[in-house]
């Protein structure tokens, strides 16, 4: 293949789509449960059907695909199950907004069935977009096993799991204080609440003691909940209030009397040492109320307004009620003061609304029975967490785990499979079959199903099982691929999802859901902001931001900061835009290269640009090789390689490749994706292209050595290319597959068997229809010459010396140099000559016994070997001028330093270390000056 017939630049447009269609149509991604290969399964963290893929999705699915492609090539029966999540709260919210903006209707304007029909339509449209985007990224999923968390199989699994836990008493229902989102009007689990620190107030309120002229002052951050107070609590050790124990205080506005009680939970140093107890609206108060059997009075509606229990304040929002109550307390002389106070406020992770502790009848999973097994799976390394520092986080969380609220007041989701008898609320039926229970069917008017749905994380917690066919009895996938190999996900959902999968899956089948968990960091983008004309910070977006990302200097007044990706901050990077601009391989490699083991991944446009250039480097490296192996055949490779014809550079690259494979295997075992990428990058770019190919170019062009040597190099290039591209394939599948298919065209059909140590495995790889199903590169079994690395290091130092002299003399990097060497007795550099000539840009190396007298040269010394670079005749005058300038500079420096060091005053006052440094610099300058003088003398 002529080099000119091969496009000079890699253009992924068009190629990627065609390649993916080829892979998918050939069913290369489809797993066989009946295979006798060892299993390797991953279940995809299902993206929500709420929109399009973001950069986090691109990251997590790239990392999984890298593992999947590596393991598939390594001989495993690979099963990567894709899927999407119904995402209860998120999807219902998005669809509600869509219906309101398009039809002007709210959810309550539809029947439940009508609304759900709209959600299903949204799901079908959105899911198709998401799956298309996963294909663009190159994800080699088994599409025949596509799952959805609301499909019939998932619904059967959810109902079965619920009933198993219900029958064992692990699921219960009761009036409990939950995290209530007044915007979405649903309960949230503890870990769905995010906490923010905000500036607030501590209010001091006076309560009058009944039948006495005394009063007690209480400090609170929420005066509006006074309407639901059922006690005042003090510490039993607080002597200030001990005489009031058992007394009652009058509660204004609602005309109730509430007791003063003693409780160990009260901190006597907080506020006045007396606190109001509102069990229905504070978690600590709830526990106190349960302990003392206090009434629990809910004062809020589901939308966060004061209800009928608030008397004259009924119908007001919380905020308005607070203002009105403070005003009314002031009028009654019951308001004392307010002080600034830092508040820790819970907000909904989904709507951003301030969470309200709210007394509500909900379903819970009791976690006490599972705590030991959750802890043991990880503590015993049955499940290994990477990075290991997250193991401590996991165990701490498990030790402090509270019962999980699993009911949600939504329409979109898995309906709770429980029916209530209308005339007897305590009469319940839990049913996991199809349709409705027989008893309900006989008397449907007397029964109603629980209107709530299950928390999305309940169905997601069963994901490893449902992806593999559970609970269906004939389930070969489950037998073959469960437990799965690894879960790859963000560290931010370790508790949301990972722990719940361990809990639910082990409770259902008695086995862990996966062996490893890799937790990647969260992606941060660089944001830039400046003050606008109004004196407000504004974020910079568009072309200006892109220019700064690419290295443009920041002007005065512009501040840069790494922050979580946010549209409002202008630092969101769209993976689909990046694929369109740079190609999928560049995006994949950029993401892998920064997938470190920390909590933060810094990502900007420069990385995509760098790896686009690297994809082009791969292309051009292969392009050069194809131009030199166009006449090579499979028969040539089958005949093997004569190792007696291998040079130092050949052993160097083969040994380097073997070392690379070993290091890559370790990196894959430890999920070190950044190392996988950078090691493959550096080996291809530096070891293979910049060093090895440069060394053998003269042989390839027929300028050095014999035709037999040339053929050996061509064979070795083909072997190395198929192997190195194979190493790169998991991280850059499109460019490597394109080149692999072209290499197969060049080599032709392989009919011959081969047992050669160097070429056999390369031929086995080339027999495959695609890298997707090709065997992974193997270590090449050759005997490495003794002292290979020491010898190669010496050759590199000789090259470095030549390059250094070239730089000193300011010779053109393309100029061919003439060099002489004088070796110590018993030392020869004959083995290194081809390498040193190729890398040093040397036309000839002459072996001498003494320095020449008739030519001008610049000399360097490497391990006793004197190496001289002859100064080209046309460069002598320029070099002499340069040396004269350097001589003058050194003489001035020596004179100045000598004068300073001869000063007794300087020596007396200066730090001894400074004096020593000045003396050392003077000594080095004198040595350098003598070298310059010697060189100038040689010009005469």
From Swiss-Prot:
<keyword id="KW-0067">ATP-binding</keyword>
<keyword id="KW-0175">Coiled coil</keyword>
<comment type="function">
    <text>Catalyzes the attachment of valine to tRNA(Val). As ValRS can inadvertently accommodate and process structurally similar amino acids such as threonine, to avoid such errors, it has a 'posttransfer' editing activity that hydrolyzes mischarged Thr-tRNA(Val) in a tRNA-dependent manner.</text>
</comment>
<dbReference type="InterPro" id="IPR009008">
    <property type="entry name" value="Val/Leu/Ile-tRNA-synth_edit"/>
</dbReference>
<dbReference type="InterPro" id="IPR010978">
    <property type="entry name" value="tRNA-bd_arm"/>
</dbReference>
<keyword id="KW-0648">Protein biosynthesis</keyword>
<dbReference type="GO" id="GO:0005524">
    <property type="term" value="F:ATP binding"/>
</dbReference>
<keyword id="KW-0436">Ligase</keyword>
<keyword id="KW-0030">Aminoacyl-tRNA synthetase</keyword>
<feature type="short sequence motif" description="'HIGH' region">
    <location>
        <begin position="47"/>
        <end position="57"/>
    </location>
</feature>
<dbReference type="InterPro" id="IPR002303">
    <property type="entry name" value="Valyl-tRNA_ligase"/>
</dbReference>
<dbReference type="InterPro" id="IPR014729">
    <property type="entry name" value="Rossmann-like_a/b/a_fold"/>
</dbReference>
<dbReference type="Pfam" id="PF08264">
    <property type="entry name" value="Anticodon_1"/>
</dbReference>
<dbReference type="InterPro" id="IPR033705">
    <property type="entry name" value="Anticodon_Ia_Val"/>
</dbReference>
<dbReference type="GO" id="GO:0004832">
    <property type="term" value="F:valine-tRNA ligase activity"/>
</dbReference>
<comment type="similarity">
    <text>Belongs to the class-I aminoacyl-tRNA synthetase family. ValS type 1 subfamily.</text>
</comment>
<dbReference type="GO" id="GO:0006438">
    <property type="term" value="P:valyl-tRNA aminoacylation"/>
</dbReference>
<feature type="binding site">
    <location>
        <position position="567"/>
    </location>
    <ligand>
        <name>ATP</name>
    </ligand>
</feature>
<dbReference type="InterPro" id="IPR001412">
    <property type="entry name" value="aa-tRNA-synth_I_CS"/>
</dbReference>
<dbReference type="Pfam" id="PF00133">
    <property type="entry name" value="tRNA-synt_1"/>
</dbReference>
<feature type="short sequence motif" description="'KMSKS' region">
    <location>
        <begin position="564"/>
        <end position="568"/>
    </location>
</feature>
<feature type="coiled-coil region">
    <location>
        <begin position="873"/>
        <end position="937"/>
    </location>
</feature>
<dbReference type="GO" id="GO:0002161">
    <property type="term" value="F:aminoacyl-tRNA deacylase activity"/>
</dbReference>
<comment type="subunit">
    <text>Monomer.</text>
</comment>
<keyword id="KW-0963">Cytoplasm</keyword>
<dbReference type="InterPro" id="IPR002300">
    <property type="entry name" value="aa-tRNA-synth_Ia"/>
</dbReference>
<dbReference type="InterPro" id="IPR009080">
    <property type="entry name" value="tRNAsynth_Ia_anticodon-bd"/>
</dbReference>
<dbReference type="InterPro" id="IPR037118">
    <property type="entry name" value="Val-tRNA_synth_C_sf"/>
</dbReference>
<protein>
    <recommendedName>
        <fullName>Valine--tRNA ligase</fullName>
        <ecNumber>6.1.1.9</ecNumber>
    </recommendedName>
</protein>
<keyword id="KW-0547">Nucleotide-binding</keyword>
<dbReference type="InterPro" id="IPR013155">
    <property type="entry name" value="M/V/L/I-tRNA-synth_anticd-bd"/>
</dbReference>
<dbReference type="GO" id="GO:0005829">
    <property type="term" value="C:cytosol"/>
</dbReference>
